[in-house]
Amino acid sequence: QVLKYCPKIGYCSSKCSKAEVWAYSPDCKVHCCVPANQKW
């Protein structure tokens, strides 16, 4: 999942939990973690 930016409900982290979507965005050096049950 490649995003233009990490959404406000998401956060930048080197490791996301299994309940989250692992995404990439230019404003995160590592991963952008987004809760899988959220609409964004």
Swiss-Prot record:
Key words, A-Z: Disulfide bond, Pyrrolidone carboxylic acid
The protein's name in its UniProt record: Meleagrin
One Pfam family, short name: Meleagrin
UniProt family annotation: Belongs to the transferrin family.
PTM-bearing positions, type Pyrrolidone carboxylic acid: Q1
Organism this protein belongs to: Meleagris gallopavo (Wild turkey)
Bridged cysteine pairs (disulfide): C6-C33, C12-C28, C16-C32
InterPro entries: Meleagrin/Cygnin (IPR012573)
Coiled coil segments of this chain: none
